[in-house]
Amino acid sequence: HDALPICSSDLRPLGIPCIEDRLIQQCIKQVLEPICEAKFHAHNYGFRPNRSTHHAISRMTFLANRAHLHYVVDIDIKGFFDNVNHGKLLKQMWSLGIQDKSLLTIISKMLKAEIEGIGIPQKGTPQGGILSPLLSNIVLNELDWWISNQWETFEPRHKYTSYNKFSALKSSKLKQMYIVRYADDFKLMCRDYETAQKALIAVKNWLKERLDLDISPEKSKVINIRKNYSNFLGFKLKVIKKGRKKVIKSNINDKATKKVISVILERIKELKKSPTVKTVNRYNASILGCHNYYRYATYVNIDFSKIAFLVSNNLYNSTKRIRGKTGSKSKAYINYYGNYNIKTVYIAGIALFPIAGIKTKNVMNFSQNICDFTKEGRELIHDKLKGINQNILQYIMENPIQGETTEYNDNRVSLYVGQKGKCSVTGEPLLISNMDCHHKISRELGGKDEYANLTFVICDIHKLIHAITKETIQNYMNKTQKFINESSLIKINKLRKLVGNCELYIS
């Protein structure tokens, strides 16, 4: 154990377990997680399988756009991870059904592991351990359900249809509120200011009385998102008028923007100091990582355009002696940035990813039926594999091509799934007896066994791609006549050109 400095100049316990401890913690987690997952609230998105920050943002967006809840209660718990009550946590685990006393003793000792230079902690969960995120969710699970039972999951005495239940609740004195939580960062969505203010006071008192946790008065407040932004997980959200509707507008928040700029400037400094393939790849990885996380902001293009402008002078001045006009574009560059009309900068012969090359992507709600621990839930996780012949997939996995590289055989499996078991030219289902894995650029011309250079086609199409003589071409044109149309012919000609053959025409 050690202590980690945090922004407020305090020290936070950082517990990074050794390999033996990590194995034990992982074993405990694998036993506890299925039990806890069944009891956790649906809209707790932090540190849970298949859920992410983007699902939390999506839920908040949904409540603002569709339910028209425009008053947000921002609550900031003071040093949550440092102030978890150990005794209360163990009691919460017991009430969840985790009643093995030996296991609870092990967890208790883990929580009280000595921190070098500080001693034995009396409260808090050390960050850095495998089990700590799950324990933090157990602590706040009680809060999730307490808030949810005020309205969302409230059970009336009479049985109602879904619509009639909502009408009955509206006519009662219950306060409409919904919780969206990611770890210790959570929002309450309410319909009016009065309800939001009451919710803030109620949650403040509940946290103190039940969990012995304090909230920060300066950071905890009610926000009308029609007038002001609410910050959540690196985004800032506000409701704006769009036509006759009011919809969420989201940007990268100010703190996250400064962090992105800081990371980019650090990568530029590395490029200037050492313009190598390694530092270029590190720079590109940082840009792509930022784009992937923040692309769900509706105004992400404007935000990154501003960031690109702010770092442009630094990038130009630091790289003007090391940049080139020509080089190669990676597969990732072509996939993510190939359609952008932005001047390409090359360093060490590799294209730098453009900072402003980003478009917004619609954020999707989490499907509550997805679960690692039920048969139905696992089927939804692997939904993309539906329609793929599992017998053929199994055959490809169990029968690698002898004499070929491991990369080639591994990519055949990925390729079959990626093409959904269909020929890339005709769209016909691939069969074990009628499928060939074609190198787009042949090995003789320098082609490799990488995924991007391979494609599955039916056998006759493969022979047509490589056919040279008129007789052979005509023979396979006749055989594949029912598959050949304008679209498939364009694909065949592209593949023929890559192997150095002439284009074909339908007479």
Give, region by region, the residue ranges found by the protein language model.
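Short cysteine-rich loop/turn motifs with clustered Cys
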Residues: 1, 402-436, 458-460
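Conserved polymerase palm-domain catalytic core
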Residues: 1-5, 39-51, 55-217, 222-225, ...
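Short, solvent-exposed helix-loop connector elements
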Residues: 13, 122-125, 249, 265-279, ...
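A conserved non-catalytic segment of reverse transcriptases
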Residues: 112, 117, 210-275, 281, ...
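Non-catalytic, peripheral interaction segments enriched in hydrophobic/basic residues
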Residues: 275, 279-338
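Extended C-terminal regions of large enzymes
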Residues: 310, 317-403
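Short, contiguous acidic/charged loop-to-helix segments that flank catalytic cores in large enzymes
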Residues: 398-414, 441-450
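Histidine-centered nuclease catalytic patch
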Residues: 427-459, 467-476
